[in-house]
Design a protein with these regions (language model features):
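Mature catalytic core of soluble alpha/beta enzymes
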Residues: 2-21, 25-27, 32-358
Length: 358
């Protein structure tokens, strides 16, 4: 069943220059006080072009300083494996291999396997091999826009296709055709959150909230003895320095990932057309639909992250169809109608509170 709420549309002014803001951010409604029986600790840091915040119950007397060091080391390992911003990373080596086999680590293999799984399940709406197309539109690691033409788009598309990836599981190796480029940006942050959560659980920590770049995974309860309450951003004015909440959602041993087209885009100075970073792998062009943001809830942040991207490609109608046909996924979608009026859909299974706006 649909759950719809109409909200006031934001006033927008098209400006003829390039705007780029790293990441999508989710407000975290963290508990202010701790219960008398168990202290909670919060660790903060920077990673993957964003920030992280980890809050956990200190019922196992974990050394916070030591854990903080392990977290940073783990995030560094993930970057060394899957960051296109690191020239010496495994993914950079794979993309420069010109068809040769490259030995990869367990983390790379897990993310690659999940990426292909989601690509198949979404009929290519999620595709980890569109790195060449992403770079053409100026959303790659170097942020340099190419000469965008129908010819160049088709040439870039010809260098993509997840079904062209070859994997040798016994040798832990991968091969991609010459000119192909793998990009895990739409799934790696979710994987990082899951990996950090598993690190906490290996320490015996049963109550925690892990947040990295707006992607969240929770378990157990917060310091007030409640399930974790997480805020979802309202996708408002692209130039706004502050942020407003659209909704507050209660997570019960669940993960949340949000994707949207309101913070990473550029505007054509001549036409005034806004081109957002979500690329449709079938057309090779930025996805054009009425969906402003998709927040997906799943047990794993990895899958929530990937499907949030797929939903932005699909648009709200296809995403609603997916959510209502899959018992393991839930979502909050913010979209507009033809007149620019805003609406919110949310899965009825979610415990959600809509935030009133003026």
């Amino acid at each position: 069943m649909y759950r719809l709420m109409r909200v006031n549309a934001a006033n927008r002014n098209g400006l003829g220059r390039f705007y780029f803001v790293l990441g999508l951010y989710t407000y975290l409604l963290l508990a202010i006080t701790c219960s008398p029986s168990t202290a909670y600790e919060t660790l903060h840091g920077q990673a993957q072009g964003s920030t992280y915040s980890i809050q956990f119950a200190q019922d196992q007397l974990v050394d916070g300083i030591e854990l903080h060091g392990e977290i940073d080391q783990l995030l560094s390992r993930i970057d060394s494996s899957m960051s296109t911003y690191v020239p010496s990373s495994l993914i950079s080596r794979v993309n420069q291999s010109e068809g040769a086999w490259v030995r990869i680590d367990d983390m790379f293999m897990k993310v690659l396997t999940r990426s292909i799984e989601v690509a198949n399940e979404t009929d290519g709406a999620f595709d980890p091999t569109i790195g060449s197309v992403v770079r053409l539109w100026g959303f790659g690691f170097d942020e340099i826009r190419g000469d965008i033409s129908d010819k160049n788009i088709q040439e870039a598309l010809a260098r993509s296709g997840f079904d062209q990836i070859k994997i040798d599981t016994l040798a832990s190796s991968v091969s991609i055709p010459k000119g192909f480029s793998i990009d895990f940006n739409a799934i790696a942050q979710g994987f990082s959150v899951d990996t950090l959560a598993l690190l906490l659980e290996s320490k015996g920590i049963q109550n925690y909230m892990v947040e990295l770049g707006g992607e969240v995974r929770t378990r157990g309860y917060n310091a007030q003895g409640d399930h974790w309450n997480i805020g979802i951003d309202r996708p408002i004015n692209e130039l706004a320095t502050g942020r407003e909440l659209q909704a507050i959602i209660t997570l019960k041993n669940q993960s949340l990932a949000t994707s949207g087209n309101y913070r990473k885009f550029w505007i054509d100075e001549q036409t005034g057309i806004k081109y957002a970073h979500t690329i449709d792998p079938k057309t090779g062009r930025p996805a054009m639909n009425q969906l402003l943001s998709a927040s997906i809830v799943h047990a794993e942040a990895t899958m929530a992250d990937a499907y949030a991207t797929a939903c932005m490609v699909w648009g709200h109608l296809k995403c609603i169809e997916f959510l209502e046909g899959n018992e393991d996924y839930f979502g909050v979608l913010i979209y507009t109608d033809e007149e620019g009026n805003w609406f919110t859909y949310y899965s009825p299974e979610l415990n959600i509170t809509m935030v009133q706006t003026d």
